[in-house]
Amino acid sequence: MEEYQQAISDSDSLKQDVAKLFYKYDLLICPTVPGPAHLHNSNTLEIDGQKVPARNALRATVPFDITGSPSVSVPFGMSSNGLPIGVQIIGRHLDEETVLRAAAKLEASNQGGYHVPPGF
């Protein structure tokens, strides 16, 4: 029970910290994953030259999942290997409209810079 209570407390602290960011910024834009997409049939990916479990790619989205912040991932080009790269746009609590508007603008400005690679 103690661990659960600590997790709730940590979650509340994270929510407060993220909310403070939006005193200054309307949106946050950051990588969706720490590198290009990995192949769907692969259980590992390479980060900084090291093979790691593919599930580690989710670590950039977890804080915003915990805080309940509205977010969306948008294609943002291709790697030198032809794999898609994405960014996530995160907004204020309950401000999905701003997040989706920004995502639509970013996607529209990236015409021709993204295509679904074979096998995806």
List each model region and its residues:
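Serine-dependent amide/ester hydrolase catalytic core
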Residues: 1-66, 116-119
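Structural helix-boundary/capping segments
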Residues: 5-6, 16, 65-120
